[in-house]
């Protein structure tokens, strides 16, 4: 009898590294997770230690195999999904990072972004990279590192330094420096990549003064990139055969591979993606045009709206405000009151993402009266996640001309039934919650498994996409629009807060 085979998905996130083992029926066999330190050197700055990312991720791989009691030669392939945009520059010779990883949430490059806008590059960048000018993306982060680490730009020109997003860093480490690659989805988040020619964009490299020598090779999201024996007893070589940025992996894991299908992931931030097939739709409404995975991991396009603060705003209630002891408590307290008593929380702690793109917005609570208590504020914070999702969906429908019939959801916060019901109420659309919650890992596993023939095609995977619960709108249109108008008013007042503070 042949040994049973499995796929391992490595899910390197913003706050933790995880490893997930799946069998052929897409059942989760075991999960291992390790958190790592968030570094905040200055207000609005966010960093990670790349060596800690590697240490936590590699140890979860060893751990998850031990937990599942399977040997490395039972692993058919490894797929990688990762926090996107986070930027690492390291020495080719030693593998030592020259600076901490600059995280996607970090706003330190706002000034560089202002220069790009003043130089009239907005339309060029939107047309060619699909992105807006914002500190969120990797390009300005790489420039910042090269500007601030002495001699680094010259070293990069000499081929001594390498740049990578987290996927690239992990594969480089897993292959002992033999493989320096990324995939189309991650490359499309750098602001350095032309999403039409599918190559690094010479003009952007010139504008940001980033040497081409340091960039990884860009490949499909589903193919064999190299082999690793990390965690392997006796040096079994396991193919690494799937890479996708976390949101594109979730889109694929939800099997949103046809034009017009959309999903929203509720994690640290909120990310809604709608597959637009082989057509790159240029957004007129503050969304991003990004690369997604087609049915066999080939290039498709998607519209994306990124909301920076979703689960992070619940953590704020817990860690800074001390209003709850556990994120799961938020649902209980939110349902202790009938409504928010007129309160709106705008969680613009690091500015606002889509469709506003205002790095100078700041968090605010509006509508406070004497009768407002902690439960109202907890409820309003949860509701802010759903309102921000509606902001994005409105923009998406305007750009694509496609009316969404159902939204597939995933991520930690979807366990919150209050939030999911309110989401359906405020959108006026069905919300579908899948049985398998680990859709990001699932997407990475699918991409890796398809590349090595573990699964033959997507038809084989369709029956595994079971919807566990469907939420339907329970409020009238007038009420929905009235509440949403209040939210829009609150957002308007939170915008451009920081820039007047000379």
UniProtKB/Swiss-Prot annotation:
Q: What induces it?
A: By L-alpha-glycerol 3-phosphate.
Against Pfam families, the record matches this protein to:
FGGY_C, FGGY_N
Positions contributing to sn-glycerol 3-phosphate binding: 14, 84-85, 136, 246
Q: In which pathway does it act?
A: Polyol metabolism; glycerol degradation via glycerol kinase pathway; sn-glycerol 3-phosphate from glycerol: step 1/1
* Gene Ontology biological process terms in this record: DNA damage response; glycerol catabolic process; glycerol metabolic process; glycerol-3-phosphate metabolic process
Query: N6-malonyllysine is carried by which residues?
Result: 233
Taking the record's annotation, the residue ranges forming a coiled coil are none
Q: What does UniProt give as GO cellular component?
A: cytosol
Effect upon mutating residue 480 to D: It decreases Vmax to about 10% of the wild-type value and the affinity for substrate is increased about two- to fourfold. This mutation decreases the catalytic activity in a manner that is analogous to that obtained upon EIIA-Glc binding
Q: Which residues bind beta-D-fructose 1,6-bisphosphate?
A: 235, 237
**Activity regulation per the record?**
Activity of this regulatory enzyme is affected by several metabolites. The non-competitive allosteric inhibition by fructose 1,6-bisphosphate (FBP) causes alterations in the quaternary structure of the enzyme. FBP inhibition requires that the enzyme exists only in a tetrameric state. Salt such as KCl reduces the affinity of the tetrameric form of the enzyme for FBP. Unphosphorylated phosphocarrier protein EIIA-Glc (III-Glc), an integral component of the bacterial phosphotransferase (PTS) system, also inhibits non-competitively and allosterically the activity.
Positions contributing to glycerol binding? 84-85, 136, 246-247
The UniProt catalytic activity note for this protein reads: glycerol + ATP = sn-glycerol 3-phosphate + ADP + H(+)
Across the pH scale, how does activity change?
Optimum pH is 9.8.
Tell me the outcome of changing residue 475 to D.
Answer: It decreases Vmax to about 10% of the wild-type value and the affinity for substrate is increased about two- to fourfold. This mutation decreases the catalytic activity in a manner that is analogous to that obtained upon EIIA-Glc binding
- List residues binding Zn(2+): 479
Q: What is its EC number?
A: 2.7.1.30
Q: Could you give the subunit structure recorded for this chain?
A: Homotetramer and homodimer (in equilibrium). Heterodimer with EIIA-Glc (crr). Binds 1 zinc ion per glycerol kinase EIIA-Glc dimer. The zinc ion is important for dimerization.
Spell out the family assignment given in the record's similarity comment: Belongs to the FGGY kinase family.
Its recorded name reads Glycerol kinase
- Species source reads Escherichia coli (strain K12)
Name of the encoding gene: glpK
């Amino acid at each position: 009898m042949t040994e049973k085979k499995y796929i391992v998905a490595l899910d390197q996130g913003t706050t933790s590294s995880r490893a997930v083992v799946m069998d052929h029926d897409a059942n989760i066999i075991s999960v291992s997770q390790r958190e790592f330190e968030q570094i905040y050197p200055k207000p609005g700055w966010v960093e990670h230690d790349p060596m800690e990312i590697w240490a936590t991720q590699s140890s979860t791989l060893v751990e998850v195999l031990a937990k599942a009691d399977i040997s490395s030669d039972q692993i058919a392939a490894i797929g990688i999904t990762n926090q996107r945009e986070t930027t690492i520059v390291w020495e080719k010779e030693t593998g030592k990072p020259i600076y901490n990883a600059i995280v996607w949430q970090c706003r330190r490059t706002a000034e560089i972004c202002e220069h790009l806008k003043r130089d009239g590059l907005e339309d060029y960048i939107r047309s060619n990279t699909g992105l807006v000018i914002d500190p969120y993306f990797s390009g300005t982060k790489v420039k910042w590192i090269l500007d601030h680490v002495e001699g680094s730009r010259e070293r990069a020109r000499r081929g001594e330094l390498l740049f990578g997003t987290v996927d690239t860093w992990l594969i480089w480490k897993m292959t002992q420096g033999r493989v320096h690659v990324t995939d189309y989805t991650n490359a499309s988040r750098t602001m350095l990549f032309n999403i039409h020619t599918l190559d690094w964009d010479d003009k952007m490299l010139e504008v940001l003064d980033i040497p081409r020598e340091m960039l990884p090779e860009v490949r499909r999201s589903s193919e064999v990139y190299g082999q690793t024996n990390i965690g392997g007893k006796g040096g079994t070589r396991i193919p690494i055969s799937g890479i996708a940025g976390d949101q594109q992996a979730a889109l694929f894991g939800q099997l949103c591979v046809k034009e017009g299908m959309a999903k929203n992931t509720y994690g640290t931030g909120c990310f809604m993606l709608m597959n637009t097939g082989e057509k790159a739709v240029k957004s007129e409404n503050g969304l991003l045009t990004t690369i997604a995975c087609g049915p066999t991991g080939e290039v498709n396009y998607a519209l994306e709206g990124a909301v920076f603060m979703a689960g992070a705003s619940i953590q704020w209630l817990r860690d800074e405000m001390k209003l709850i002891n556990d994120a799961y408590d938020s649902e209980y307290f939110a349902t202790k009151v009938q409504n928010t008593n007129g309160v709106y929380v705008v969680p613009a702690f690091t500015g606002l993402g889509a469709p506003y793109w205002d790095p100078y917005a700041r968090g605010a609570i509006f509508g406070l009266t004497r009768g407002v208590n902690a439960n109202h504020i907890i409820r309003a914070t949860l509701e802010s996640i759903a309102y921000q999702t509606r902001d994005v969906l409105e923009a998406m429908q305007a750009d694509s001309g496609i009316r969404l019939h159902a939204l597939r959801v995933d991520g930690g916060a979807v366990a919150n039934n209050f939030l999911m019901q309110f989401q359906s109420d405020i959108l006026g659309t069905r919300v579908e919650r899948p049985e398998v919650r680990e859709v990001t890992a699932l997407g990475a596993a699918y991409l890796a498994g398809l590349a090595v023939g573990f699964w033959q095609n997507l038809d084989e995977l369709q029956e595994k996409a079971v919807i566990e619960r469907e939420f339907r709108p329970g409020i009238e249109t007038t009420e929905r629009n009235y509440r949403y108008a209040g939210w829009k008013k609150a957002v308007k007042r939170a915008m451009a807060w920081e820039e007047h503070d000379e």
